[in-house]
Amino acid sequence: MSAEPEGRRMLRLEVRNAQTPIERKPEWIKTRATMGPEYRQLHSLVKSEGLHTVCQEAGCPNIYECWEDREATFLIGGSQCTRRCDFCQIDTGKPAEFDRDEPRRVAESVARMGLRYSTVTGVARDDLEDEGAWLYAETIREIHRQSPGTGVEILVPDFSGDPELLGEVFGARPEVFAHNVETVPRIFKRIRPAFRYERSLDVIAQGRAAGLITKSNLILGMGEERQEISQALQDLHDAGTDIITITQYLRPSPRHLPVARWVRPDEFVELRDEAEAIGFLGVLAGPLVRSSYRAGRLWAQSMRAKGRTVPEELRHLADASLGFAQAVS
């Protein structure tokens, strides 16, 4: 992504950010580009069919692993977000016209790719009366209809915390309901000005009350302090979060927030152990972990921890490996 955003002038914050050059990554942040047979087949299919996934278009470092396990992530609602977070690669601007056919097309892509587990995320659509709640819910329903053996994880904005809008999504019964808090209270407003920390916790609490497996994510290296991470983990658990992923911030472009620090692998191991001790049912932590990484395995693990039966058509997810991005001691 270039420093200059498409279709608008840079904000003063972005101009200030751009004064700091892109940071050089430390030696421990490395990816493994192992192209197995499932990855090769999926890559060929996506290319020939003209399909679109976040995995490919965002250059995710874990694409080789996830595609080998037939897991992929899709972005809905357009390419322009009505909100701006200082770490996020998605551009802010006026969204395109609402596309009611998008859920069907995404579900067709999931079916054609033969996915075992799909993650669906999207942009905030504050321009719409329902903030896009129907779009998220209908995408879940369409994937379940076209691919009954595929798990669906939905990663949503906050829908302003409105119980009615959230209820639309809950009613579609995704395997996992995810809403990412991303950072700690002290720097939350600066980094995510259109969101509110307590409101995000309440969104997760509402998902838990609806009987769904819940999930969130923390990004490290944006200016937080160590004890603040511990408090955020406790806050998330108290709100009813079942699954937590913890990752390193990687700056998308010069106009985004500069990296405050590089978190060493041993700190990720420490945080993983801490999160497990707090009581999270599923934890993945590492520099290259992303919120959708090994998502199917984490869901199956959480289901078993709750004493729930994993449907027969999804039991294969429980046997997936932890993956290379998980930090190890």
Curated annotation (Swiss-Prot):
The Radical SAM core domain is annotated at 67-281
Q: Output the InterPro entries linked to this UniProt entry.
A: Aldolase_TIM (IPR013785), Elp3/MiaA/NifB-like_rSAM (IPR006638), LIAS_N (IPR031691), Lipoyl_synth (IPR003698), rSAM (IPR007197)
The family database entries (PROSITE patterns) matched by this protein are listed as: RADICAL_SAM
Where found, per UniProt? Cytoplasm
Q: Which reaction does it catalyse?
A: [[Fe-S] cluster scaffold protein carrying a second [4Fe-4S](2+) cluster] + N(6)-octanoyl-L-lysyl-[protein] + 2 oxidized [2Fe-2S]-[ferredoxin] + 2 S-adenosyl-L-methionine + 4 H(+) = [[Fe-S] cluster scaffold protein] + N(6)-[(R)-dihydrolipoyl]-L-lysyl-[protein] + 4 Fe(3+) + 2 hydrogen sulfide + 2 5'-deoxyadenosine + 2 L-methionine + 2 reduced [2Fe-2S]-[ferredoxin]
Cofactor(s), by name: [4Fe-4S] cluster
Domain of life where this protein originates: Bacteria
Which keywords does UniProt give here?
4Fe-4S, Cytoplasm, Iron, Iron-sulfur, Metal-binding, S-adenosyl-L-methionine, Transferase
The positions annotated for binding [4Fe-4S] cluster 2 are C81, C85, C88
Query: What does the record note about the cofactor?
Result: Binds 2 [4Fe-4S] clusters per subunit. One cluster is coordinated with 3 cysteines and an exchangeable S-adenosyl-L-methionine.
**Binding-site residues, [4Fe-4S] cluster 1:** C55, C60, C66, S292
UniProt key word Nucleotide-binding = no
Q: Family assignment?
A: Belongs to the radical SAM superfamily. Lipoyl synthase family.
| Annotated protein name in UniProt | Lipoyl synthase
- Its source organism is Leifsonia xyli subsp. xyli (strain CTCB07)
Gene expressing this chain: lipA
